[in-house]
From Swiss-Prot:
Organism: Staphylococcus aureus (strain MRSA252)
EC number(s) recorded for this UniProt protein: 5.3.2.-
UniProt cross-references to InterPro entries, sorted A to Z: 4-OT, 4-OT-like_dom, Tautomerase/MIF_sf
A Pfam family per the record: Tautomerase
Name listed for the protein in its UniProt record: Probable tautomerase SAR1376
Disulfide topology: none
Active site positions: 2
Family label: Belongs to the 4-oxalocrotonate tautomerase family.
Length: 61
């Protein structure tokens, strides 16, 4: 049972998230041969002030 965790900054539309789940599922199915029904995709959206790169929060850029 593949479980794929995707972390990204919030702000995508519901349609974009729907497509992300579908495309990730397709890729895992194709590359691993896993049964599509067993593939789980978990999306975690982060607030820009909860994520930083090189010591700077995304909300401060």
């Amino acid at each position: 049972m593949p479980i794929v965790n995707v972390k990204l900054l919030e702000g995508r539309s519901d349609e974009q998230l729907k497509n992300l789940v579908s495309e990730v599922t397709d890729a895992v199915e194709k590359t691993t041969g896993a049964n599509r029904q067993a593939i789980h995709v978990v999306i975690e959206e982060m607030k820009p002030n909860h994520y930083g790169v090189a010591g700077v929060r995304k909300s401060d850029q």
